[in-house]
Every structure is written in structure tokens, then in C-alpha cells.
Regions:
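Active-site anion-handling motifs in enzyme catalytic cores
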Residues: 1-275
Length: 275
């Protein structure tokens, strides 16, 4: 059995850990967490900024070592975290094999930077989460509230909890499969975490992106990129001033179709690289 050495952060966060837990189960593979210098796959997450040469001298020196040690990397369901590179458009790897990308914004940038065309599926691998669970769980909660793992103790979260009945506060630091299942058990989801929204899409659960403040890393670009895969605009609901999204609004503004999600699931599944 080939070992998939996947580059992802070693932190307790569902959106990162599904790179191992979910991919192993769905594709019957063995996954080892790796760094850019020794990975053979970059998958779920916003890692593409890191595969281009930096303008920072110390970072460039580290990247030279990566280039010397690793020159053959597969890309599946990955995107950028920022709108602009902090460096050059030169790749640190000699050979990349692109199988799927996060969104249309990522595709356009990759084609611009590399000069290649990428006729590949678009979407996040987290859309396969429903297949990981093996079905659609019975609903237990009216609303699931998912703060980004760095915002779990944000004061606005307490106000959200007081605003809904039969809610579930979902902690992305818990066991990834338990987190995924709990999202599927909700009638609606509000989330400041992108992967909270993506997992909800996987279960066809209407959801809404909320912002708790303007301090989160990435400035919203990865959200715009994800929704560009569906041909949609990104419109977050700002909770920073104490506003709370009404239930009806969450349902009425949700526009990711179940049909589009199912099509992407199949395309992304088929596009997964065989090493």
C-alpha cells in the first residue's frame, strides 16, 4: 500500500485532521502527516501560497532545501488563503500534478502563475464528509453554532447561544468524525469556520457564514474562492456589532444546491490521485 505523505498543520482542528482520518477511510489508504519538504500530496486546506517562492530571505533559504529534497508533489482540493502572493510566482517544486483545486479563483491564479491550463474539478475535499459518515444522520438540533477553533471563547458566541433554542455548540477541536456527524445532525448551521460550512454543504444543511470580528487570518479570500466553485458570491453575516442572524434568513439566503454538491462529490472522489 502506498503511503500518502500529506502536508497539513499538526493542530487539533477538524478542517485539518480530515486530511488523515477521512481520507484514510474513504480511499482505503495510509496517510502520514508531513511537511512541504517531504510530502507527496497537498490536499484539503489553503496551502497553495506556500508552494511559491517567498520574497523573505530566510523563507527562501528554507524553500531551497525543500526544492532540493522534494520535486514531485500532487495537488488535490487545495487553494490560496490570500488574494495576492507574498513573493514570486515561481514554484518551489519542479513538478506538480494538479488533480483538483479549491475554486475558480484558485484555478485562474494557478493558470496565470504557471502558464498551464487546469481542466480539473473544483471544490473542497470536505464535501466528501457525508460519504465518510455513510449516510444522512437523523436531525437532533435546530441550529448548530460553529466558531472557528481560534474563536471558541469569543464573547459573541455566548450571545449566539442565548439567541436560539435547541442549539448545538460544535467544537472543531473534538474528534473529527464526531464533529462531522454532529454537523449532519443539525437543521441549520451558522459558522465562522469555512470547514464548518463545507461539512454542512456535504449534508445539504442550509448554512450561513458569520464573522465575529475582522481579525481572522486570510481576510475572507478562501471563502470567496470556495463559493466561486459553485458560481456564487460570498456574503457573510457580520455579528461583530451584536447582530444575530434570524432562522428564516439562514434558510432563505442559502443557495448551494444539493445537486451541485453531489456532482462535486463524485468528481472530487474520482479525481483523487493514485500514487
Amino acid at each position: 500500500m502506498s503511503i500518502y505523505k500529506v502536508a497539513y498543520p499538526d493542530i487539533p482542528n477538524m478542517g485539518d485532521l480530515i486530511n488523515k482520518d477521512m481520507l484514510e477511510d474513504i480511499f482505503s489508504i495510509s496517510v502520514k502527516q508531513a511537511e512541504l519538504k517531504n510530502c507527496n500530496l497537498i490536499a484539503i486546506g489553503s496551502a497553495l501560497d506556500q508552494i511559491f517562492k517567498s520574497s523573505d530571505f530566510k523563507t527562501r533559504m528554507k524553500q531551497k532545501m525543500i526544492t532540493a529534497l522534494n520535486n514531485n508533489v500532487h495537488i488535490w482540493c487545495t487553494g490560496f488563503i490570500r488574494e495576492n502572493l507574498r513573493g514570486t510566482s515561481d514554484l518551489i517544486y519542479k513538478n506538480i500534478h494538479v488533480h483538483a483545486l479549491w475554486g475558480e479563483l484558485t484555478r485562474q491564479r494557478m493558470e496565470k502563475y504557471t502558464g498551464n491550463k487546469y481542466d480539473v474539478p473544483l471544490g473542497d475535499g470536505g464535501l466528501l464528509a457525508q460519504r465518510w459518515i455513510g449516510g444522512f444522520p437523523k436531525k437532533k438540533y435546530a441550529v448548530g453554532i460553529i466558531p472557528h477553533f481560534k474563536e471558541q471563547d469569543h464573547p459573541t458566541v455566548k450571545k449566539l447561544l442565548a439567541s436560539y433554542e435547541n442549539f448545538a455548540l460544535i467544537d472543531l477541536r473534538d474528534n473529527p468524525k464526531d464533529v462531522v456527524r454532529k454537523i449532519g445532525e443539525c437543521e441549520l448551521i451558522i459558522s465562522s469556520s469555512l470547514h464548518g460550512l463545507i461539512i454542512a454543504d456535504s449534508f445539504h444543511v442550509p448554512n450561513l457564514h458569520i464573522t465575529l470580528d475582522n481579525k481572522m487570518f486570510g481576510d475572507g479570500y478562501k471563502y470567496r474562492d470556495y463559493y466561486s466553485a459553485f458560481g456564487l458570491e460570498h456574503s457573510p453575516f457580520d455579528c461583530a456589532k451584536g447582530d444575530v442572524p434570524p432562522i428564516k434568513m439562514i434558510r432563505d439566503t442559502y443557495s448551494v444546491s444539493a445537486e451541485a454538491v453531489e456532482q462535486k462529490k463524485e468528481a472530487l472522489f474520482k479525481a483523487f490521485p493514485k500514487l
